[in-house]
Structures are given as structure tokens and as C-alpha cells.
Amino acid sequence: MLDKQVTITTGTLITLIRRRGGEPHTILSETPTWYDEGAQRAEDERTNEELASQGLFGPRGLHPGFKATLEAISRPALEYYGWVDGGFEGKALSFTVLAGSAGGEGFVLARHSEHDGVALASVRPEELLTEFLDQIPKLAPGRGRPVAVPKSQVETSRSSSTAQDEGFEVLRSGRQSAGSQEADELRRILSLRRLGSGSLYVAARGRSGARQRIERPVNYIDTTEGRWLTEEIPGSGEPRIAFTPADQQVLGERLRSAQGRLFAS
């Protein structure tokens, strides 16, 4: 277990994961990188020098607490992760975050999308979800009540995995329907200035060691009127697109519920 937060380059963390036979998490490396023998030797030397400068590597090898945390990062038994767009101290900020645990070790790490650095800290495994949610910028729930609109009234264009780019658009109709007021409210929410968004996942390993991830992320959007959970709700008939005022508690409840369905079949 680490006794303090450390910041290392993304390349160094990826090298350390691969030394342990693991595969870098998708939030760290979306494109695999391969080195020839000479390049790999140089990368190993650079990694050791960087760690030594922070007191994490010495004549006896890796710092014991850091080594234990790396084992959990390389093969977490439980993980929460996501892509977040938001702001910090008035500035736009996009980053990825991963919290995981294995073998009694817990960790949380964040990677800024535009900078080559990963901030890493140890956490108590039983507080994993709370620590994960604490990395997400806080915002009050959206002002209003939950709204749900039949999917046929919604045009969806997904150009990326984040909620910010989902592009929900309610189709207008000259014919009034029972759900027209909710459609108008959903349209109003979508017209609000966007402050940020997020797509959050949970994954776990079963007894066989196989990893399973939830099929759909927990998505939210941040507007000038607060945060809204956005989700598609299946039913016996047509699915509905639902927007629900959300805070950290609501996001946590959705992630716990999704986690409970892993390996259910």
C-alpha cells in the first residue's frame, strides 16, 4: 500500500503492468504499443530512472507498498472506470479515472487526457466506489423531475463513447400525444448549455478469472441547471429514453445495481 499519492508517466505505468504479464487498461492505452528488444531495454531503463527519482525503486527493487499496488492495477478483481469531461477551477478538463482492488489492495488513478501523467493513490478496498465517485466533479442534481420519452421520439447519433457526444434529439410532431409534455421538457434540457459529461463502467472477475464488464455505461450530462443521468430503459414494449436528476449518490446506486447483474446469467 502506498503511503502517499504519486504521479508517474503513462508509459512507465504501462511498462510496469506488462512486466507483470498484465495488459494495460483501456483508459491508459487504447492502442497497443510494441517495442523491439533495444527499444524495450531503453524503456525499462527510463522507467527505473523515473521510479528511482521518486524513491519507488532502489537496489532492492520496487518499493514494497508500490509493488503491492501495482499487482492490483495489473489484474484487478473489481474495477470502476470512466471517461469524464468537466471542469476544475474554471478550466475545461477531460480525464479518465480507474479505481480497482485485488488481494486486499485498493487503488484509484486518474489520467489527464492531454498530459502524459497518471496520479495514483492507495485506498481501502471497501471504500472503492466512494473514492471513484469522489474523482468526478460534483454538481447539483438537475432542476426538475425525471422525464422519459419513447425511443421512437428520439434520434440518437453516437459518434463516441461519451455521453456528451450521444446527440439525443427529440423529433417534433404536429400531433399532440400523452407524452408531449415530457418530450418538450427533454428537449428543453438538451437545449441547455453543456458543462460536461461522463460515461462510467464497472467490471469484475468471476471465479474462473474471466473478466466481465457491464454492457452499457452509466451516462450523465452536466448542464447549467445541474446533472442529469441519461439512460435507455427497456420494457415489454418500446424502450424509453429517460433523464433523471442525478448526484453522486444516484450515480453510485446505478453502478451498484449494474455490478449486481454481472455474472447473473
Question: What annotation goes with each model-predicted range?
Answer:
Residues 2-265:
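Short, surface-exposed polybasic-aromatic patches that bind anionic ligands, especially phosphate groups
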